[in-house]
Swiss-Prot record:
Protein species of origin: Natranaerobius thermophilus (strain ATCC BAA-1301 / DSM 18059 / JW/NM-WN-LF)
Origin organism lineage: Bacteria, Bacillati, Bacillota, Clostridia, Natranaerobiales
Domain of life per record: Bacteria
Name the UniProt record assigns to this protein: Peptide deformylase
Record note on cofactor: Binds 1 Fe(2+) ion.
E.C. number: 3.5.1.88
Disulfide bridges in this chain: none
Biological role: Removes the formyl group from the N-terminal Met of newly synthesized proteins. Requires at least a dipeptide for an efficient rate of reaction. N-terminal L-methionine is a prerequisite for activity but the enzyme has broad specificity at other positions.
Keyword Iron recorded: yes
Similarity field: Belongs to the polypeptide deformylase family.
Gene Ontology annotations of biological process type: co-translational protein modification; translation
GO molecular function term, any single one: peptide deformylase activity
Entry cofactors: Fe(2+)
Length: 156
């Protein structure tokens, strides 16, 4: 549908807690489509609505496996004790990467666009992507969690 401008760096919308979605309608459906289009155009694996200037608790994630996740009001309801440190980047921080420690497994509860409750048991890259995008909904970026941050060319 439409490619939206991705908000970057210190845009205030990235630091605000997003509002819970109370109405799933055509506007929300368009938002999800625009988010997917924007994410794919930017060659990302996830995008949160605040990253395109919309303060709503909505994320999309596609790590290139079977399912494309379009999640409304997602929340992490459980995490594994086991943690892993890995490199992360973010479409809102172009050219930057950071080492972030996160739980290896998470359980996420959310609504899908059909207003059905979903429970997602995720691990590995999917777990990391879900945590990263849900953080955006709480005004937290990977920069806030990173133990070190550097330009992409410095990571080798």
């Amino acid at each position: 549908m439409a490619i939206k401008k991705i908000r970057t760096n210190d845009d205030p919308v990235l630091k605000r807690k997003a509002k819970k979605v109370t109405n799933i309608d055509d506007r929300l459906e368009r938002l999800l489509t625009n988010m997917l289009d924007t994410m794919y155009e930017a060659e990302g694996i996830g995008l949160a609505a605040p990253q395109i200037g919309i303060s709503k608790r909505v994320i999309v994630v596609d790590i290139g496996e079977d399912e494309i996740y379009q999640l409304i009001n997602p929340e992490i309801v459980d995490t594994s004790d086991e943690q892993e440190k890995a490199l992360e980047g973010c479409l809102s921080y172009p050219g930057l990467q950071g080492r972030v420690t996160r739980p290896v497994k998470v359980t996420v509860k959310a609504l899908n666009p059909q207003e059905e409750e979903m429970i997602i048991e995720a691990e590995g890259l999917l777990a990391r992507a879900l945590q990263h995008e849900i953080d955006h909904l709480d005004g937290i970026t990977f920069i806030d969690r990173a133990e070190e941050v550097f330009r992409e060319e410095e990571s080798h």
